[in-house]
Regions:
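Short glycine-enriched loops at secondary-structure junctions
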Residues: 92-95
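Surface-exposed interaction regions that form or flank ligand-binding interfaces
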Residues: 1-74, 81-86, 97, 106, ...
């Protein structure tokens, strides 16, 4: 009798196990969805560099968390170092219609009838550039730091955008338009060493601090 009961319950326990596995899988996906979404955009930019900027003089640094003058932190998606300038790249893996201009504090993403607000990425990158200006003040002039905003191809701009805001790989031509050597090889090495020295080690602590910093900026 016991053996028969176990045989009857075995498929039930097996099904319950799969349901629990699916439940936790969905939960984990939802928790990490914003992180994964951001990473997909960053991977796309890294792929653009590999495919279209094959000159070894271009050096791509990814996902840098740096301290600012207030003791807070700022996270930079990409830094592209080159003799022609330093390109500070903010990626946005957003789809749908995008509304915004250079001066607006908040931009809008519209997908069908749903609208979502997000921080102006130009303002975000301005903060990144100011941190870099201070960090590299004795090595490179501020006007050699260039802001680049990259949305994914699924985004559609519904308002005119500044000339440094792009979809997909369009930003590559902008970078290539800078073709005059402005930074020596020695200075590029110094910049790399300075960044390696100042960048914060990746950890859950720095991630939490960055999230809190973003929340505070949105509220201010």
């Amino acid at each position: 009798m016991e053996h028969s009961t176990i045989q009857l319950l075995s498929p039930l326990w097996s099904s319950l196990g799969w349901i629990l596995l699916l439940f936790f899988g969905v939960l984990i996906f939802k928790l990490f969805k914003p992180f994964l979404k951001g990473k997909l955009g960053e991977f796309a930019v890294a792929a653009h560099v590999t495919l279209y900027l094959k000159d070894p003089q271009y050096i791509l640094l990814n996902d840098l968390t740096l301290p600012d003058e207030t003791g807070a932190t700022t996270q930079i998606d990409h830094l592209l170092l080159s003799p022609y300038g330093i390109f500070v790249i903010e990626t946005k893996n957003y789809k749908g219609w995008i509304f915004g201009n250079e001066r607006q504090k908040i931009w809008t993403q519209k997908i069908y009838k749903n609208s979502y607000k997000f921080q102006n990425p130009i303002h975000q990158n301005y903060k990144h550039i100011k941190v870099l200006e201070q960090l590299l003040a004795d090595i490179v002039e501020p006007d050699l730091l260039h802001s680049v905003i990259v949305f994914m191809p699924d985004a559609v701009f519904k308002t005119p955008m500044p000339n440094h805001v792009f979809r997909g790989a369009g930003w590559i031509d902008y970078v290539k338009s800078f073709d005059q050597q402005m930074i020596s090889e020695t200075k590029l090495k110094r910049i790399q060493l300075r960044l390696e020295k100042e960048v914060l080690e990746k950890s859950w602590k720095t991630n939490r601090e960055q999230v809190e910093n973003l929340k505070q900026r949105k509220q201010s």
